[in-house]
Every structure is written in structure tokens, then in C-alpha cells.
Amino acid sequence: LPDLSIDHLKMGLIRSGHCPLTPESDDADLTAYLWPIVREIIKTAIENHQRLVVEGCYIPFDYRSSFESRYLGQIQFVCLCFSQAYLAEHFDVIQRYANVIEQRLDDSGCTKEQLQRENEENLRLCQQYSCPYILLEYPYHIDLDSL
């Protein structure tokens, strides 16, 4: 399936000078800037009968309010959240594999406490807005070589 990384879109807009924000800007500001663009990309894919995976943290939890029902029937949303217990016990594993998908230049700001706060807030917002989520509570194994 084709995919769109909202983070790649963000960095392209920032590096090209077409975005007044920076990578360090507040997530709420980045979401407010990026979501209208991403929303219209999603609509275009649906109208063209194309499948598209859109991934990233800049999708608002009230995303449904951005679409008419004819679009909503074509959208599958899922949020991945770690439980507090999982993060407390397996933070070292998360750090060890942080660069598997993309090479991160500086992850020093990523702390166990920060991830716990973010995941707790994401879970709360999923529940508030009735968004589907997967709560990762137990160790799991994904064989990356088989993908």
C-alpha cells in the first residue's frame, strides 16, 4: 500500500521555506498547519479510488468533523498507544529500536516520562472522541526481516 508520512510532508514544507513553523514547534501548531493539507490529500485519494496509508501524529482526534459521511465510510483510523506499565518496563527496548524505521538525528528529548504523558493523553483523547486504538500492554514480537 502506498503511504504518506505526515512528518515527511512537514519537513518538506519547512525545508522549502513554505511553512513558518520549525521541527521544534508545538504539535498543536503543526497539526493546525498540516491537517488541512493532509485532509485534502485524503479526500483526493478517496475520490480517485486509491488506497493510502497516512501515518503521523498530526491527525487531530476529532478528524471525523473534517469529512462528509461519503468520505468517512472509506477511512480506517487506528491509534497505537502504549500502556503506562509497558512504558515503565520496556522503555529501554523502545529506545533501542527507535531508529528501525527512520534514523533520528537527536532523540535526547525522548524520555520515559514524556512518552508516558503523551501516551496517556493519546489514550484519553481516543476515548473522548471514540477513536479506535490498540493499547500495547504486553511484550510483542515483530520479525522485521519477514516484512
Report the location of each language-model feature.
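Conserved nucleotide-binding/hydrolysis micro-motifs of P-loop NTPases
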Residues: H8-M11, I59-P60, C81-A88, Y140-H141
